[in-house]
């Protein structure tokens, strides 16, 4: 293999150690390798950085192994060009495997320019990404705790969820606290209802006439407190996220124009893909990186169905979730596209396809700095008509005819003229 870089290094990163191999290519001489092992404490990583600087290394390569690569990258990124590669792309040939051999293999790949760099956003975007990913975890924990609470109510035969549309609204929480205190009758608890729920007080009183014991009340108090604690954490996170989003207000204003994209989805898009679309070769590469492109499986000239490739799980999950409110937008292109695909391919594949469309729209809006333009619900009908005409024309021409297609002339108006007013 042709060696392109004179001085480079490969790192095999683990939880407690980093094995570093410096590869030196001097004209007219055989390549030389220097291998050292460092710990992963901050002062040890700084010693690694100083050693690489003494060896005049210009590029450093490593695998994206879990989260262990992140502290190493943070120490080295200011002084070296750091290439973080997908572990599946760097895998060595079968044979004896040691940490030293892995570091040497990575150094060889860096030297020959054979590692495809993974997308590593800037530090502000990495911080925003950490906040949003933790917010998602809290949201999932909140949903799980709410489900546990409602299952507990069903166990005690409290049918609050059958009458109230939102168990955790103002009325629902007041009733839950009354259930915990055990100081009111079902009719008195029904009087705590507010708004439209007051019209259902009789039905609500019957729903609250269950069989709650002390254990149920104890668990209910803990679960309600847990839900409220998570809500407080999410509120604090939202404030910090809003501060981090201050430099990206223009991009946020563009992205929220897309149907189904609220401020959370827009923030996730910015944190996961950034705002500079030039880091992706094309919109197709971005879709593949996100795991939203169709699978490709071709053998012996035959194309077969295949699952979508693995990609950015956080981005993919958020966009698939955003697809459902997007398809509920009346008169939108997404709605028509979803129901056409759902009839042929099923609901899940249709949702993934809409998520792909949202990502494509976001890419072009960020790359060109343009507003969102909906194609409309009738767009696919017009496309279908054009394709049908072209297919029929082609079939007739194969039979030896010359076809000229013109639009139909409007029919003359046959209604009698109205009599002039006297």
Residue positions per predicted region:
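A detector of single, family-specific signature residues
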Residues: 1-422
